[in-house]
Each structure stands twice: as structure tokens, then as C-alpha cells.
């Protein structure tokens, strides 16, 4: 059975994703993907995990843009979520995607070195 915080996290995820497509006009916010949302059990804090396609400078600019839009996003959450208290929002860059890319590149290196070793043995 779902906890209420998980349902709220899912609703926040959908709302922020929709706002990124339709509502936010900040030029610093580029190709952003919301990868997950965790809401505390007391519903006072929503941690929003995101990834960005681009350089480190673009990642930092996007995080600044998202942080400057927190008030607007929270206001929109208050309009659409029927809750007594609208959670505060914290944006965090999701390093798991970068970590996954790093693992994938290591596996490709291992695979290519094994193939070259097999060719040399033949």
C-alpha cells in the first residue's frame, strides 16, 4: 500500500514536469528532466532530483534557475494540490545518471580491450 507521501511525490513530479514544459520562462532552464521526487512523511519538504543535458556551467545555471523559480512552483503546487501545507522544495542534481554513464563507459572499455586481446591471441 502506498504511503501518502509517495502519492504526493508523484503528484509533485507530474506538476513540476508540466511546469517545465509550459510555465517556466527562465532562459537558464534548458533541457531538464525530473528524475524523481521524495517527500518527507510530514509533507514539509519535497526534494526534487533533476538531470540536465549539457556542460557543468549549464547544470549550475539550471539549478540556479530552478531555485529562483521555487516560489512560483510552490504557488502552483498550492493551486493544484489540495493540502493544508504545501511542501518546501529543494532541487538536487541527480548524480546517478552520470554515475550510470560512467559505469557504461567502463564496461565498453573492458569489452573493447577483451575483443582486442582475443584478436591478438588468434
Curated annotation (Swiss-Prot):
The keyword Ion transport does not apply. GO terms for molecular function: ribosomal small subunit binding. InterPro entries: KH_dom-like_a/b, RbfA, RbfA_dom_sf, Ribosome-bd_factorA_CS. GO terms for biological process: maturation of SSU-rRNA. The keyword Methyltransferase does not apply. PROSITE patterns: RBFA. It is found in: Cytoplasm. SUPFAM superfamilies: Ribosome-binding factor A, RbfA (SSF89919). Keywords: Cytoplasm, Ribosome biogenesis. It comes from the Bacteria. GO terms for cellular component: cytosol. One of several proteins that assist in the late maturation steps of the functional core of the 30S ribosomal subunit. Associates with free 30S ribosomal subunits (but not with 30S subunits that are part of 70S ribosomes or polysomes). Required for efficient processing of 16S rRNA. May interact with the 5'-terminal helix region of 16S rRNA. Monomer. Binds 30S ribosomal subunits, but not 50S ribosomal subunits or 70S ribosomes. Belongs to the RbfA family. This is Ribosome-binding factor A.
